[in-house]
Amino acid sequence: MFKKSYQFFALVLFSIFNVLVTSASAIDLDEATRTVVADSNGNTTVLTPEQVKRGKRLFNNTCGACHVGGVTKTNPNVGLRPEGLSLATPRRDNAAALVDYLKNPTSYDGLESIAEIHPSIKSGDIYPRMRSLTDEDLFSIAGHILLQPKIVTEKWGGGKIYY
C-alpha cells in the first residue's frame, strides 16, 4: 500500500514539475522594445519575435564564447555597449553596420582588417561556425546585440561586476 502511494505521489510531483517547466516561455517584448536602428540614416526596423529568438540562439552559439554579456573577453576595452559601438569607425550602432562588420571585421578605428583574428564570413575557413550563416542570420545576431541594452540595461557590456 505504501509503495503504491509513494509511486502515485512521485508521479503527481513529476507531473506538476513538468507542467511548470514546459509552460515557461520567454518574455514577450513589445514592439517598441523590439525596434532597433536599421541603418546609418537612422531608419528603424521592428524585429519579429522569431528574429529575437533566433538572434539570441545564434549569438550564444557563435559569438557568446568571447562576447558573453556584451563584453569582449580578448579586449575588455572594446565591448558591445551602444556607446562603444557608436564611437567605432565606421559606427557600428545599427543593424546594417553590424552585419557588414560580421562579414568583414575591421579594427576599432576602421583602418585594418581583423578577419584573421575575429570570426567573420570572410574568415569562415578559420572559424567554421561562421560558414553557414546567412544574411538573415547575421541580421538576427545584429538585432540581438542592439536589443540587449534595452532588456538587460547597464549589465550589457558592463563587465565582471555583473557576471
From Swiss-Prot:
Main localisation: plastid
Gene3D superfamilies: Cytochrome c-like domain
Lipid bilayer topology: Peripheral membrane protein
Cofactor(s), names only, from the UniProt record: heme c
Binding site for heme c: 63, 66-67, 118
Subcellular location(s) per record: Plastid, Chloroplast thylakoid membrane
Cofactor note: Binds 1 heme c group covalently per subunit.
Pfam families noted in UniProt: Cytochrom_C550 (PF14495)
Example of a GO MF term: iron ion binding
Entry keyword set: Chloroplast, Electron transport, Heme, Iron, Membrane, Metal-binding, Photosynthesis, Photosystem II, Plastid, Signal, Thylakoid, Transport
Range of residues in the leader sequence: 1-26
GO cellular component entries: chloroplast thylakoid membrane; photosystem II
GO BP of this protein: photosynthesis, light reaction; respiratory electron transport chain
Domain of life: Eukaryota
Function: One of the extrinsic, lumenal subunits of photosystem II (PSII). PSII is a light-driven water plastoquinone oxidoreductase, using light energy to abstract electrons from H(2)O, generating a proton gradient subsequently used for ATP formation. The extrinsic proteins stabilize the structure of photosystem II oxygen-evolving complex (OEC), the ion environment of oxygen evolution and protect the OEC against heat-induced inactivation.
NCBIfam families linked: PS_II_C550
Record family assignment: Belongs to the cytochrome c family. PsbV subfamily.
Subunit structure: PSII is composed of 1 copy each of membrane proteins PsbA, PsbB, PsbC, PsbD, PsbE, PsbF, PsbH, PsbI, PsbJ, PsbK, PsbL, PsbM, PsbT, PsbY, PsbZ, Psb30/Ycf12, at least 3 peripheral proteins of the oxygen-evolving complex and a large number of cofactors. It forms dimeric complexes.
Record-given protein name: Photosystem II extrinsic protein V
Annotated organism of origin: Trieres chinensis (Marine centric diatom)
Taxon lineage: Eukaryota, Sar, Stramenopiles, Ochrophyta, Bacillariophyta
